[in-house]
Amino acid sequence: MKYLLILPGVLVLLVLIAVVRTLVSPRKTSDYQPPQTDEAEALRLAGKLSKMIQVDTTSHAGGDDPARFRAFHKTLAELFPRVFSQLEKTEIDGNLLFYWKGRSREKPILLMSHQDVVPAEGAWSHAPFSGDIADGKVWGRGASDTKCSVMAFFEADEQLLAEGYTPPTDVYLASSCTEEWAGDGAPKLVAELQRRGVELFLVCDEGGAIISEPIGGIPGNFAMVGVFEKGKADVKFTAKSTGGHASAPGKHTPIARLAAFVTEVETHSPFKKKLLPEVAAMFRTLAPYASSFGLRLLLGNLWLFAPLLKLVLPAVSAQAGAMLRTTIAFTTQSGSDAYNVIPQEATLGANMRFIPHQGEQESLAIIQTLAEKHGLSTEVLHANDFTPPVDIHGEAFTLFTRVIGETFPGLAASPYVMTGATDAQFYQPICKSCIRFAPVIYGPEQMRGMHGLNENIEYRCLPGAVRFYQNLIRAEK
C-alpha cells in the first residue's frame, strides 16, 4: 500500500525533471534558405532540367519502350558531354550505368535516381512536358520526381571533369527506367555490378529530401535522410456464398463479411506500435525546433513520454504514425454487377507496409488470421519485406550527414523512415548503407505535385544540389 502512495509522487517528480530539462534546453530555429546569389547559376541549371523534362519518359508496368529513353539519353549526352565521353558507360535495356575511376578502389560510392516518370493526366497550369520556367520554378512531370536529382549529379560530374578532377574513390552513376512500377531496371544494373565484383560503401538515391515542416508543429527546412524502407504487399481478400436475390438477403453476405473485416481492422489495428531507434533519433533531432513547449517536452523526453507518443502520434500525423507500425490501406473492391443481386463472390484489395518489428511474415499471418475469423480467404499478390536499416552511427551515415552540414550550413539533418519504395531496395545485396536523400527542397507544393497535377521544383535550390553531390564525391571516405 505504501508503494502505491509513493508512485504518484515519483511520477510527478519525473514529469518535473522532464519540464526542467525542456526549459533549460535552448529552442532552435531552422531558417536555412538557398543563397540568393546563385540566381544566374540557378537559371542555367533550370534550363538543363527544362530540356530533360521536355522528353517524355513515361513508363508503365510491363512496358518496354527503349526508344523514348534513348531519346532522353541523347538529350543527356548533349547537356553533359564530358560525362558521356569520359566516363565508362553501360546501357542495359534503357537503364544507365556510368563508372568514374578514382584514385582508390576502396569504398566506392553510387549516385542514382530514375529517369522514368508516371503518367501526366488532368488539367495542368503548365503543360506536363513543357519544362516551363516560371514563377521561380521549373514545371513538368519529373521536375521533382526525379529528373532534378539526375540533372544535379550529372552536372556535378560534368563540372568536376572539366576541372580535370579525379575522385578519391570510384564513383558510379545509375539511372533506371522502371522505378515507377518497381520493374527490373535497377536489378539489371545491380546484376552487372555483381558481375564486376563491386561492393559499394554508400548508395545515394531519392527518398528523403530537404523537407519543409516534416511534422506538424516543427517549422522550417530539415534534411530528412531516409535510412530504410518499409516492406510492402498487395493482398486480395475474397468472400464467397451461394448468392441470391437482394429481395430476400440472408445474414453474413460476402459484402457484409468484408465490411465487418474492414471495420475491425480500422477500429482496432492488429499491429503493434513501437518506437524504433531510427524514429526515436528523428524525434530527438527535431524536438528543439518544435514551435510549442508541449511538443518540445514530448519529443525531447522520450525516456518518459514514449508510451504517450505512441498513443497520440497516429492521430496527430498519419505520416509519422506510419513509422510506428505496419499499416494496411484498403484500396479496391468488387462485387455484384447488379444492384439487386447478392454476389456469389466479393473481393477486397489492400496495400500493406511492413515495419521491422513485425515484418512480412508476421504481419501477413496476423491479417490472414483476422480474415479467416470473418470467413475470408487471403491471396498475397506481391510482397517484399522491409530493407535492413542503415547504421545511423556508422561511418557512411556520419560522412553523409557531415556533407549535408558542409553544403547547407545551418540545416539540421535527421534520420527518416521511408514509407514508400525506391530503387535503392535492390542495391541492398551489394551495399549496407543505402541512403535515400535528394538534396533539393520539397515544400507542400512540391509534395502535392509528385504523381499529381502541376509538378514543379524551385530552381533556386538546384545549385545547392549540384554542390552537395560534388562534396559527396570529394569527401575522403
What is the meaning of each model-derived region?
Residues 252, 363-371:
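Short amphipathic alpha-helices in soluble, non-transmembrane regions
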Residues 138, 144-224:
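Acidic/histidine-rich catalytic neighborhood of metal-dependent amide-processing enzymes
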Residues 89, 99, 211-212, 271-337, ...:
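An extended, acidic, His-containing surface patch that forms the Zn2+-binding/catalytic region
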Residues 228, 249-251, 321, 338-343:
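Short, solvent-exposed beta-strand/turn "edge" segments of beta-rich domains on protein surfaces
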Residues 115-116, 265-270, 368-376:
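A common structural junction motif
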Residues 1-9:
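Feature marks short, highly hydrophobic, charge-poor N-terminal signal-anchor/signal peptide-like helices
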Residues 8-141, 162-167:
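Acidic/His- and Gly-rich active-site-bordering loop/insert found
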Residues 187-192, 247-270:
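A short core secondary-structure module
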